[in-house]
Amino acid sequence: GARHWVVRPNHVRPDIQTTIHGITHTHMGTSPDFSAILEPLLQAMTGRVVLVHYNRIERDFLGRAVLDTTGDTLEFPVVDTMELESRKHPVFRPNFIQRWMGEKDSPSLRLAHARERYNIPPYRPHHALTDALATAELFLAQMADQFTPDTPVSDLWI
């Protein structure tokens, strides 16, 4: 099941937390340290493959937080909808001559743009649960479009 935690950051960036994510000083002041949610987080991840859009965010954040908290590293399987979308739409940036000949950049791999290509309704971004649901909807559309029910999960994770 879906779940999220707001944790107190080690380095406060009020401009990002409030503007992008809507997390206020009140939220941060009453939130636990990462160490308090590490055990339930690891339990929630055990035996599961994490679904994300742009794995570097989750892997870098969780990797850094676990390293800072425990001194250990954290490796976990991830299915990345951005990576799956890049397989269908490889990144292409045409040079001057190619542009002159009418070549276009590859489409954006951002979550909202990828969802739009599959005719999935827009959503309000930058809330953990909403982003998770939006990513799950995109994943279902990608599976129906690009893969078969027999596709092993090992072909999808990175």
Model-derived features with residue positions:
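Acidic donor-binding loop at a coil-to-helix junction in glycosyltransferase catalytic cores
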Residues: 130
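Short, function-defining helix-loop hinge/capping sites that tune catalysis or transport
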Residues: 30, 66, 88-91, 139
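Beta-strand segments within the central parallel beta-sheet cores of soluble alpha/beta enzyme folds
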Residues: 77-80, 154
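Acidic two-metal-ion nuclease catalytic site recognized across multiple nuclease folds
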Residues: 117, 133-158
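Conserved non-catalytic scaffold segment of RNase H-like nuclease domains
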Residues: 1-76, 101-122, 126
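Generic recognition of well-ordered alpha-helical segments
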Residues: 84-87, 114, 138
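Short alpha-helix plus adjacent loop in nuclease-associated cores
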Residues: 19, 79-105
